[in-house]
Curated annotation (Swiss-Prot):
Alphabetic keyword roster: Amidation, Antibiotic, Antimicrobial, Chemotaxis, G-protein coupled receptor impairing toxin, Immunity, Innate immunity, Mast cell degranulation, Membrane, Secreted, Target cell membrane, Target membrane, Toxin
Function: Antimicrobial and mast cell degranulating peptide. Shows low antimicrobial activity towards some Gram-negative bacteria (E.coli MIC=300 ug/ml, S.typhimurium MIC=300 ug/ml) and all Gram-positive bacteria tested (B.subtilis MIC=300 ug/ml, S.aureus MIC=300 ug/ml, E.faecalis MIC=150 ug/ml, and E.faecium MIC=75 ug/ml). May act by permeabilizing membranes, since it permeabilizes liposomes composed by phosphatidylethanolamine(PE)/phosphatidylglycerol(PG) and cardiolipin(CL)/phosphatidylglycerol(PG), which mimic the membranes of Gram-negative and Gram-positive bacteria, respectively.
Additional information: Negative results: does not interact with lipopolysaccharide (LPS). Has no antibacterial activity towards some Gram-negative bacteria (P.aeruginosa, P.mirabilis, K.pneumoniae) (MIC>600 ug/ml).
Leucine amide modified-residue sites: 13
Predominant localisation class: secreted
UniProt GO cellular component terms: extracellular region; membrane; other organism cell membrane
GO MF terms, alphabetically ordered: toxin activity
Membrane-spanning intervals of the chain: none
Expression sites by tissue: Expressed by the venom gland.
Listed name of the protein: Crabrolin
GO terms for biological process, alphabetical: chemotaxis; defense response to bacterium; innate immune response
Domain of life: Eukaryota
Amino acid sequence: FLPLILRKIVTAL
């Protein structure tokens, strides 16, 4: 998993 995608998921929370 890329950090960019992971951060986007965290921001969606």
